Amino acid sequence: IIDGQWDQNYSYAEKKDLLMKLKKTLELKEFNGDLIHFVDVLLQNVEVLHRKDTVGSLLRDQYMAENVSWILQKVQQRGNDCIFISRHNEHIAKWGSYDSMWKLLSNQYRYYVIGTNFYKTRCNLPEGNHKRTIQTFYSHDLLAKTTKLASFKMCWIDFSSLEEGTEIKRHADAYTYMGTLGESYSIMNRSLPPSYRMFQPPTTLYDNMIYVSNASPTKIIE
């Protein structure tokens, strides 16, 4: 794996075969079950990247939900009953048009969701061939813009504390654009801004949100 991407010299079948052999070797040598699970996660990654259809997206959320449950079980064995996880907004949102990670987990666990959004962001994104590009995006989110105009670098809003009838409550309940950037860059992001935005009411998706006025790109340390 190079910069988080599989070496393209290996085919799907070769990657899967290599990992299956590694898993079998670990099982025969009776290695720690955690290590075997990590190999299973790599197998999941190979499978998801191989599937380019809608089934692949659904499979990804299914695997994420399974892995979160696995992590929680490990934490519970150590005497704790809560975990804090970080995921893309669409995977943790309380509502979605497909079986997202949250939808799957919400059938088993209580779940408190913190969303994030930006007014302006510069992102360091992979664009294929192990190259990266820094691109600028705007969410067009009114609450994020308010954070910027109020001169806040960051702002946290607990939606449960908003009073009915107030302007901020109306904006939080209303449909608005929110940034939803993924882990890669496409020319479509530049020519078709809705490709990196979703149009939903913030209070429908999250229990509260963190707004960032100007987000800076991640610095990759070689």
Predicted regions and their residues:
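Structured catalytic-domain cores with a bias toward divalent-metal coordination
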Residues: 1-222
